[in-house]
Amino acid sequence: MSLNPVIFSIGPVSIYWYSLAYVLGIVFAYWYLHRLDDQKIFTKNFYDSLLTATIVGIILGGRLGYVLIYDPVLYISNPIEILKTWEGGMSFHGGAIGVLLAVIISCRRHNIPIFYALDLVSCGVPIGLFLGRIGNFINGELFGRVTTMPWGMVFPESGDNLLHHPSQLYEALFEGLLLFAVANSLFFLTRIRLYHGALTGIAVMWYGIARFFVEFFREPDYQIGYLWLDLTMGQLLSIPMVLLGMLVYLGALNLKFNTKSVT
């Protein structure tokens, strides 16, 4: 399977599907926040501040996370490669930290309840994750392990001409579409949003569990391979995510972050 990662080129400038995925994900989240904020707590200045901070957080956090966690040697020897974000190489965990900091900073600047904002962000972010994984699929990167299943695909970057799991699509489903469905079903059909932070905790737990599971089908990063107990880096990073999500969820229920505390 080989798809052209470039949408079109104008002279030396090329527009990539991967980059478009990020743009569409951010635009959707920005639009969706407006619809979810039924209490009208967010101001225009807050939206503008959050949008700017989120873009910076995703790019810097995602790229630096990948550089530091997955391939520091390559980027130390070729630092110019750090700037080539359109070629892929973004860490979800780094990007998540970047988005978290963006939300915290924007909320503090505009006196917005942090966990109220994080719950709403958790409802929109999964679509960005879905689009990002589709971008990975088009790039032919982050493919799965060798398989005999009929839906296996040949990825040129594997260099072996064997069938591999299209693990990018698995992640797009479990970390993207299903998380979006679960988070929004809970938001609209239950009273969980009365406990600010509970939905954030569930979303973080869901992602960690989904990522841990899908990693069993995903080819480990060639420069890292298998680590402790034959787990991948993605799985090891997902374990603290699940624990953190559980703590946030239980804390939200115990501390009763409900709408009465919103001022």
Swiss-Prot record:
Single GO biological process annotation from the record: lipoprotein biosynthetic process
Presence of keyword Transmembrane: yes
Name of the top EC class for this enzyme: transferase
GO cellular component: plasma membrane
Membrane topology designation: Multi-pass membrane protein
Top-level taxonomic group: Bacteria
Molecular function via GO: phosphatidylglycerol-prolipoprotein diacylglyceryl transferase activity
Record-annotated membrane-spanning stretches: 6-26, 50-70, 85-105, 112-132, 169-189, 197-217, 233-253
EC number: 2.5.1.145
Protein keywords: Cell membrane, Membrane, Transferase, Transmembrane, Transmembrane helix
Pathway(s) served: Protein modification; lipoprotein biosynthesis (diacylglyceryl transfer)
Location within or outside the cell: Cell membrane
Binding, a 1,2-diacyl-sn-glycero-3-phospho-(1'-sn-glycerol): 133
The UniProt record lists the keyword Transit peptide: no
Pfam families assigned: LGT
Family: Belongs to the Lgt family.
Function: Catalyzes the transfer of the diacylglyceryl group from phosphatidylglycerol to the sulfhydryl group of the N-terminal cysteine of a prolipoprotein, the first step in the formation of mature lipoproteins.
Protein name: Phosphatidylglycerol--prolipoprotein diacylglyceryl transferase
Organism of this sequence: Wolbachia sp. subsp. Drosophila simulans (strain wRi)
Name of encoding gene: lgt
